[in-house]
């Protein structure tokens, strides 16, 4: 079953190695295949990955977009070790994220991390 994607005017999306920018009207299209897909709002850059959880998210994002877990594995393991030592309450989510990575479900790993980014922001704002 194809993935249905609706883009707002000028919204961008990454499909595989390509960035697609929508024109000035709302657009809907269907995507068949297994290329990595991320909406602009879900993409972090090196500049925006400025917290421990965001660095982990960026690492998993690169695994996903480049389809290369081993290239980022050591970096990921270092980041999660530091995070769990600093915030033990994040362990359960990090374990679930790691299980998704181990089973090759990188998009699910990213989805698992998104609420953790919000929790981290709440902790940092105190």
From Swiss-Prot:
The text of the family note is: Belongs to the FlbT family.
Domain of life per record: Bacteria
Q: Which UniProt keywords apply?
A: Bacterial flagellum biogenesis, Repressor, RNA-binding
Which NCBIfam families does the record match to this protein? PRK12791.1
Respond yes or no to whether keyword Repressor is given for this record.
Answer: yes
Q: One GO MF term, please?
A: mRNA 5'-UTR binding
> Which species is the source of this protein?
Rhodopseudomonas palustris (strain TIE-1)
Signal peptide region: none
Keyword Secreted attached: no
From the UniProt record, list the coiled-coil ranges. Answer: none
- Quote the HAMAP family the UniProt record gives: FlbT
* Protein name (record): Probable flagellum biosynthesis repressor protein FlbT
Cited function: Has a post-transcriptional repressor function in flagellum biogenesis. Associates with the 5'-UTR of fljK mRNA and promotes its degradation.
Give the record's GO biological process terms: bacterial-type flagellum organization; mRNA catabolic process; negative regulation of bacterial-type flagellum assembly
Q: What is the lineage of its organism?
A: Bacteria, Pseudomonadati, Pseudomonadota, Alphaproteobacteria, Hyphomicrobiales
> What InterPro entries does UniProt report for this protein, alphabetically?
Flagellum_FlbT (IPR009967)
